[in-house]
Amino acid sequence: MGRSGKLPSGVSAKLKRWKKGHSSDSNPAICRHRQAARSRFFSRPSGRSDLTVDAVKLHNELQSGSLRLGKSEAPETPMEEEAELVLTEKSSGTFLSGLSDCTNVTFSKVQRFWESNSAAHKEICAVLAAVTEVIRSQGGKETETEYFAALMTTMEAVESPESLAAVAYLLNLVLKRVPSPVLIKKFSDTSKAFMDIMSAQASSGSTSVLRWVLSCLATLLRKQDLEAWGYPVTLQVYHGLLSFTVHPKPKIRKAAQHGVCSVLKGSEFMFEKAPAHHPAAISTAKFCIQEIEKSGGSKEATTTLHMLTLLKDLLPCFPEGLVKSCSETLLRVMTLSHVLVTACAMQAFHSLFHARPGLSTLSAELNAQIITALYDYVPSENDLQPLLAWLKVMEKAHINLVRLQWDLGLGHLPRFFGTAVTCLLSPHSQVLTAATQSLKEILKECVAPHMADIGSVTSSASGPAQSVAKMFRAVEEGLTYKFHAAWSSVLQLLCVFFEACGRQAHPVMRKCLQSLCDLRLSPHFPHTAALDQAVGAAVTSMGPEVVLQAVPLEIDGSEETLDFPRSWLLPVIRDHVQETRLGFFTTYFLPLANTLKSKAMDLAQAGSTVESKIYDTLQWQMWTLLPGFCTRPTDVAISFKGLARTLGMAISERPDLRVTVCQALRTLITKGCQAEADRAEVSRFAKNFLPILFNLYGQPVAAGDTPAPRRAVLETIRTYLTITDTQLVNSLLEKASEKVLDPASSDFTRLSVLDLVVALAPCADEAAISKLYSTIRPYLESKAHGVQKKAYRVLEEVCASPQGPGALFVQSHLEDLKKTLLDSLRSTSSPAKRPRLKCLLHIVRKLSAEHKEFITALIPEVILCTKEVSVGARKNAFALLVEMGHAFLRFGSNQEEALQCYLVLIYPGLVGAVTMVSCSILALTHLLFEFKGLMGTSTVEQLLENVCLLLASRTRDVVKSALGFIKVAVTVMDVAHLAKHVQLVMEAIGKLSDDMRRHFRMKLRNLFTKFIRKFGFELVKRLLPEEYHRVLVNIRKAEARAKRHRALSQAAVEEEEEEEEEEEPAQGKGDSIEEILADSEDEEDNEEEERSRGKEQRKLARQRSRAWLKEGGGDEPLNFLDPKVAQRVLATQPGPGRGRKKDHGFKVSADGRLIIREEADGNKMEEEEGAKGEDEEMADPMEDVIIRNKKHQKLKHQKEAEEEELEIPPQYQAGGSGIHRPVAKKAMPGAEYKAKKAKGDVKKKGRPDPYAYIPLNRSKLNRRKKMKLQGQFKGLVKAARRGSQVGHKNRRKDRRP
């Protein structure tokens, strides 16, 4: 129990406080609700009005026409005439009547400000309304030029900062749309007005005026042509803008920097026939260098940081000489070892290289010099963020150097590889990832594209080849044991290296392959998959022949032991071999596989079953390499003839190899016969392979065997026929037709031969196809369903040919085909429907308008097929319906009328038999979805009305189809048109019988959900009977629940994205000119946010700007003249506290002894450490003392309350055996309800009623433990009964008088 009268800990801080002596006051200090109530009774508001004196003055002067733009001149330009016309008459409208109906789209954003409570927004609205009214009163057309003239005149008249900011904001909007000739003509007067305001407002407290004036000035300068930049006055105005890039106020500085970037990158003459550099680039660069040198050595380096931020965007815009000067300046300021300055300088270099500028900006020599200089600024491997930035900058620098001059760039890469590989020793995983990614990108971007030019890479090579060898040696060093923690990253690098350079550099990589194989054999090697991937990359690029020369298989069939330490190479080669010599398989693997097969057979005869199985598996693995060797081989024309006989024998005599060899043949034909000579060579052996494959396919599958080999044989036949000579195909087709007609052929043989005919038909000539058609025509009406289906499959393959003999046959026999298909309609079996519909689909695609009757005759059959059992038949039926619709669209000139004619042919099905009605609705549903853009509104509405009538059917099939149609209609129809029929649909659904409503409850629920989303809950509820209301309420609850869940999920996703953005390194602004010229028109809407965010950023900046100096080792003094002294300036706090270490529960003293304290002492130490951590961040010692005292007082009060409520548990915990056995009791479910001072359980507020619960436990399935559980359950039941009886007796006693 807590102390009487004392509030719980933490509650007192939430209560309302009052000053001493005012505890009895009852009148509230805040009375905004009373003031709001008074304003309803026509009293004057007590607060400050938004109508200022300046606004009234501005309005009066605009109305009187006394304001003019500049001196009175003769009306030489259209702009001056418009200005005079605008300001002559008085307005007769109200004060703000020109705001809501302003016709110029430039100010569409301002019209949204009217409802804002911001005084700045209301001032903008007032100024725009006044200017618009004056322009209208003068008969103006409200063009951008008229607004520009009126606003410039207004700017000279207003005095208060609020009005001036409003005018400048509107000018900023309108200047972007004013024609360039106008701004060029009025540049002198306009720029003078802006410069005067900038001078007057430079030291004022308000930032709004300067922000918008600077933006206006940047837009004005951007519109000037190249000739105007030759005048000194233009550069003088630009320098005025440039001087504000070092302004102490961030919003002004940001506006100026944005303006400078937009001028240098986005001036109008920089797009077409642009000069090499902007005329103002030189003076800008000199200004940046001067400002950095002026303030570079100061302690805070604020101006330096501002200039570096500007250089980050502008460095790629400068000429080469100034880029060199800026780079030297950046390198000089980096020697100051100021952490933030170094980071910003790195960002500037990154933006320079990332922009990939031309030679006029960055030459290859200068790029190389910068790379060399940056090696003096390599951060410490323990300094995480600076090292990540340095690696990224160097990656971009080398990629850009290779782009400019590849041989020079390759010469610089070995040094970077050596440095980056050293980074793999860093304890930070982020550094490992960044270094690995940088090296991989360089290999892909810089090395791989030039390997063909480099040629063979050997250990004695020179030039670029020598550089590649050095780079590989640097990566290969990562396989030594000191890099064992980074072996995963090293293997990734080797994988990319093999892919990029393996073909040319394999002489220097052989030793590495041997090391990899030895490493894989080491016990408990954890990176087997990555190593296999690296060796696989070597196989792909070098070829298996080179890899096996470096690391032989060591398998020859004469082994004394069965270890086979390098047998793991066979699966690796299988998965990665391609584009290699097919002859190598013939000369190396084929003889070895035969030797191992013989060895396996000998061992099997000798009774050594296990050894025989091992050798048999090895030879089978060697055969599985064949498909890879057949993938784009380099010597098909030379090597295939030596392999063809072996493959034929393997197919016919080795069932275990049949699938593999067939796959190899298919791969060779599809991926290895691109050259005509290769194609001819493989085609030459078709007369040998096809008869073997035909005979195999004709053999029945033995009992217990899988049909996979048979399918593989048929697929191989199809593939081989694509390159077979037509005469051979015709002869094979003729023999197959004879076999089909042979009465002695069994059903299995006839079906198998028909499968072969299906494969042969598309490759035969027209005469052979005509003869085949005569052969299969009687089978289209066969009563044997399998034969009939195969006959239709033959016809389908012939009709599917888009060109060639098949297309010619269809064109010449079209009438005969139509007659045959219509005559065989009634005799078509269900299995034959799928190929028949497919055949009709291909024929309908080729029909013209005169064949309209044929399509009309097909419609009833196709509609009924939408309910076929076969999924394929249903799909083909729907596809054919859509194709018929497209045919009608081809036939007619008006698409809507043509589609209506097609639908009229389907409508009669709605009044036929039940099955026909259901199928017709399904067909109309599919057509509605497919042709929703072509159906007229009246057609869709008519369909919907008819389907609603069919909802009254007593057949579930019809109702199901009708509900499906309504669901599609709701999705497809426009809300405005659907709204007319909501009542009709709801009434039809409301009249459904109870049985229908119960059966289709899920469909109805989905339908109601769609209607509620479109028309609202109340309307749907009003239109439906009361028995549906409960469902509707549940739907509304489910929708609200889903909406809340989506909102929470979205918030979580956004939070994760924000965290990821915070974790990402800082990047420069967008590279595109569109981002630079994007409107920066957001006013002070987010000032409060920025202000609060600014405090956090300043706190973070103080932390980030801190630097730590790493001392020398031992008593050795730190040498500040050492060129690598910059590496000792760390942005990350050094020492053991930075790493994530294991907490053993005890503090350790400086000499390594454990410090064991009581818990209270530990809390005290934590408090002192927490206070100490805060001390380091406090600037004022007195402020620190106050904060610490307050903190200790608060902790003291909390501690006192906790000591009264909690009792410290003993430190000793039982364990071990004997008297030290575990004594903790198991937590029993429901134990928290047990009464402390009585028997039984008690109810607790906010918790469910007491319960007895036996948890499910898998161990209770044990027979012995099951009996124990039964006893436990019986005890619970008895206790419950006993408690019930006691309670019953007590209630009876209470009822007695």
From Swiss-Prot:
Biased composition annotated in UniProt, kind: Basic and acidic residues: 1090-1099, 1154-1173, 1233-1243
Alphabetic keyword roster: Isopeptide bond, Membrane, Nucleus, Phosphoprotein, Transmembrane, Transmembrane helix, Ubl conjugation
Membrane-topology annotation of the record: Single-pass membrane protein
SS bond list: none
Main location: nucleus
Listed InterPro entries: ARM-like (IPR011989), ARM-type_fold (IPR016024), RRP12 (IPR052087), RRP12-like_dom (IPR012978)
Protein's recorded name: RRP12-like protein
Similarity annotation: Belongs to the RRP12 family.
Glycyl lysine isopeptide (Lys-Gly) (interchain with G-Cter in SUMO1), cross-linked positions: K71
Membrane spanning residue stretches: 903-923
Keyword Methyltransferase belongs to the record: no
A Pfam family: RRP12_HEAT
Domain of life: Eukaryota
GO terms under cellular component: cytosol; intracellular membrane-bounded organelle; nuclear membrane; nucleolus; plasma membrane
Bias (Basic residues): 1188-1197, 1288-1297
Location of Phosphoserine modifications: S49, S66, S72, S97, S1049, S1072, S1080
Region (Disordered): 1-29, 1047-1101, 1131-1297
Phosphothreonine PTM positions: T77, T88
GO molecular function per UniProt: RNA binding
Record's compositionally biased regions (Acidic residues): 1053-1065, 1073-1089, 1174-1183
Expression sites (tissue/organ): Weakly expressed. Expressed at intermediate level in testis and ovary.
Subcellular location: Nucleus, Nucleolus; Nucleus membrane
